[in-house]
Design a protein with these regions (language model features):
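Conserved glycine-rich acetyl-CoA-binding loop
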Residues: 101, 110, 114-128, 137, ...
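Conserved catalytic-core motifs of GNAT/GCN5-like acyltransferases
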Residues: 144-147, 159, 164-180
Length: 190
């Protein structure tokens, strides 16, 4: 097995800056993580404006205590973080609707990994954690997500995780006067 593949299998990742290997830990976030989550979320919205709905201005106006509420795990929402030591380097969320007829479905949202940590299978580990949570904690049998038409890397990642495109919403988002389509993807768990 290639050393990088072996490290990824052991949950270790290394930033692409050539620094020594780091151990990446994936865990459920809570209110205590609000400040570091907010910092990563603002970087995500700033560096990938076509991948996130809020603008940087809109998201930067959200106070830390509101992020704390959003991060508190419930029966309908959970957010996971990837940590290099104490530093949050990646995030994703999963939510579902508790109404009985659609409680079997959950939606993955907000997948982001800091640029220096990409290519180390961290996004896959975050998706695995969110998927396991939806299946095991909530009994979900189906996951959905959306990906912007220009984010080919993310779409390939989602396809490699078993997601299949099932539809496209034309002109779903307008960024700086340009319209973008959103692809809807689904994964059946059971």
């Amino acid at each position: 097995m290639h050393p990088a593949t072996a490290a990824a299998a052991r949950g270790q990742a290394r930033p692409s800056t050539g620094t020594p290997p780091m151990t990446i830990t994936i865990r459920l976030l809570d209110a205590a993580d609000a400040a570091c989550f907010r910092a990563v979320r603002l970087r995500a919205v700033d560096t990938a404006p076509t991948s996130f709905l809020p603008t940087l201005d809109e998201e930067s106006q959200v106070p830390v205590d509101e992020f704390a509420k959003r991060l508190t795990p419930t029966q309908v929402q959970a957010v996971f973080g990837a940590f290099d030591g104490e530093t949050l380097v990646g995030i994703t969320g999963v939510r579902r609707d508790a109404r009985t007829k659609i409680a079997h479905k959950a939606t993955i949202w907000g997948v982001y990994v800091d640029a220096a940590y990409r290519g180390q299978r961290i996004a896959q580990a975050l998706l695995d954690s969110a998927t396991a949570h939806a299946a095991n904690a909530w009994g979900c049998s189906q996951l959905m997500l959306c990906v912007n038409e220009v984010n080919h890397t993310a779409e390939r990642l989602y396809a490699s995780q078993g997601f299949v495109r099932f539809g496209t919403e034309p002109r779903s988002m307008c960024v700086d006067g340009r319209f973008y389509d959103e692809h809807y993807m689904i994964k059946t768990l059971a």
